[in-house]
Amino acid sequence: MCKNTTNNSVEQQKSLFSLPEPVLGKKIKVVFNAPDMSSNGGLLLARSSKDTLPSKMGRLIPDDRTQCLVRHSYEEMVCQRVNQILCGYEDANDCDRPRCDSALKMSVGRRPSDEDLCSQATMTRLENNVDSKTLYRIGKLFVEQYVKSFSKPPRHVILDADDTNANTYGAQQLTLFNAYYNEYCHMPLLIFDGVSKKLILPMLRPGRRNKSLNVSRILRRVVEYLHECWPNTVIELRGDSHFCSREFMDWAWSKWYVRYLTGLSGNTKLLDIVDKPRRRAENDFKKALEKLHGSDSKDNVVIRRYFKLDYKAQSWKHEQRVIAKIEVSAKGTNIRFVVTKNRNNSPKTIYKRYCKRGEMELWIKDVKYFKADRMSCAKVRSP
């Protein structure tokens, strides 16, 4: 006997796509026998509120058009662009295909019977109309949204910063060849919350690693804004050696609320300082190999040692605390350095905290899953 599933009530069908807010005062009833079908019904779930981040971004773009002739507001167009990306239409050139889709219309606040959404030409004009001041306001909006996501000020915030490649395949502005990735690309800077995994700020940058001075200016603005919102919160920067800039360390030295935990590139002076501990670790590794039995594998033998030292580079104003990790295995000797403002915890604890920044690579992958690295626009200022 087969169970009859064709007589599902309308109330059961409505519960699958219930919305907290109707579209232009009209309730949405989901049925599967209407002539106007859409495969993008999930957009109605994504439209949980009118005051979304894309809506706020659209309101930040100055509109110099003759308003009596405007048929598509910038707020609606930005929402349309974002929702199209969710549906798999990543380029502005794709606007002509889904512009008449009923679900896409309702996701931006229109009725299915209303006129179609904007075309490719209109969307392209919007993207080319964005200037640097607007991009700055949008970047500030991201940080403001991050602050508003907390019900109360946190005691401690970790800023995980890193850049990644966004490959380009045309004549885009500021696209450069990156030898590490062996590709022509942009190098966006991404800042995440290391605890809550929230995206704080994305920023598109040229296709090479940014100079430390430019990165320091960006980080300082973010930290200063967070401190204005949360005066009693400790803000800690965590990143690789690229973010170990003397400008940021010198600025943060007298700020009690700013800490940093970044990688440090090794040099001959640092290697000379840890030479004796390195030799002791290598001797311990040899002794461990001698104790192995015939069935044991030497690949399982790893010797790790952690040390702290005070070090001052020639360009630094102040002496910094440096953590050295010496790892000896069958693959050889690996020495890593980390510079920090934290002088309370043990060297091993500090280095373990630094290693947690590796989780950020997974968060960057999640961002790329939503086509954030799609670089189809010729102008670098185009969203």
Where are these regions (language model features)?
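An anionic, glycine-rich sequence signature occurring as long contiguous blocks
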Residues: 2-4, 9-26, 259-367
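A short acidic (Asp/Glu
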Residues: 170, 245-250, 271-275
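Short, surface-exposed basic-aromatic patches at helix termini and helix-loop junctions that form
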Residues: 249-258
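Dynamic "connector" segments at or just before major functional cores
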Residues: 1-210, 214-229, 254
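Short amphipathic alpha-helical "interface-anchor" segments enriched in bulky aromatics
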Residues: 49, 95, 349-381
